[in-house]
């Protein structure tokens, strides 16, 4: 393994809730209308300091997508997923973008999001942008 380089962001930052590693800037949020099994999730145009898992096809609320889970590069915690391919034409805007689960990250103001006990969403994503 090589040397680990971790980028430090400036501005309104979303970080890994386990180790504090910077993951994304609020200015890169595309949508706050996404959902995961733990509650809310945000779609970002750019995330940093993550590694990708294996690419797989998943049936989500908006159809079939090819995705890869993403993990914090420092502590290895799963923090969301990245869209590789959207199989529906209307969902192509998601390609190359990443979703961070609010339950797994700390907000710019230091806020934590707790898992919603009412939420049960199979195949996590949303239609509205």
Swiss-Prot record:
Domain Yippee: 12-109
Gene Ontology CC entries for this record: ubiquitin ligase complex
Disulfide bonds: none
Pfam families: Yippee-Mis18
Taxonomic path: Eukaryota, Viridiplantae, Streptophyta, Embryophyta, Tracheophyta
Binding site for Zn(2+): 16, 19, 72, 75
Molecular function via GO: metal ion binding
Organism in which the protein naturally occurs: Solanum tuberosum
Protein name per Swiss-Prot or TrEMBL: Protein yippee-like
Protein family (similarity comment): Belongs to the yippee family.
Alphabetic keyword roster: Metal-binding, Zinc
